[in-house]
């Protein structure tokens, strides 16, 4: 499994190119991940969540699974600080 938990959202538009969830990152990870491997993404930044969801949905190597359960619910330090958060679970095609 691949976990991307509360990575830097780079909120300024000119910095969006620095976000980890990009097409190239997803392609690089997919190259090393066999079919069926889950990618778990969680953020407390709604703008980053929306952008990441669009990128993952458009990527040919990943399929978003809205019904997939989150594998664990032990709160991270960032999760405890966040007012709310959103998650994506995607499976390698």
Q: Can you annotate each of these PLM segments?
A:
Residues 6-7, 42-46:
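Short strand-turn motif at the edge of the Rossmann-like AdoMet-binding core
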Residues 19-38:
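A short glycine-rich, Lys/Arg-flanked "PGG" loop and its adjoining helix->strand segment in the class I
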Residues 48-93:
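Class I S-adenosyl-L-methionine
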Residues 15-16, 40-42:
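Short, glycine/charged-rich beta-strand-loop motifs at protein surfaces that mediate ligand recognition
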Residues 1-20:
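A short SAM/SAH-binding and catalytic strip from SAM-dependent methyltransferases
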Residues 2, 21-24, 59-61:
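Short, low-complexity, polar/charged sequence segments that are solvent-exposed and flexible
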Residues 14, 24-25, 66, 82:
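Solvent-exposed, flexible loop/coil residues
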């Amino acid at each position: 499994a691949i976990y991307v938990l509360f990575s830097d959202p780079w909120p300024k538009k000119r910095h969006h190119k620095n976000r980890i969830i990009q097409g190239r990152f997803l392609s690089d990870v997919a190259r090393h991940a066999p079919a069926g491997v889950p990618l778990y993404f969680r953020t407390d930044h709604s703008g980053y969540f929306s952008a990441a969801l669009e990128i993952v949905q458009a990527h040919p190597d990943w399929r978003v699974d809205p019904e997939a359960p989150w594998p664990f619910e032990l709160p991270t330090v960032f999760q405890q600080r966040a007012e709310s958060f959103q998650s994506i679970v995607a499976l390698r095609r």
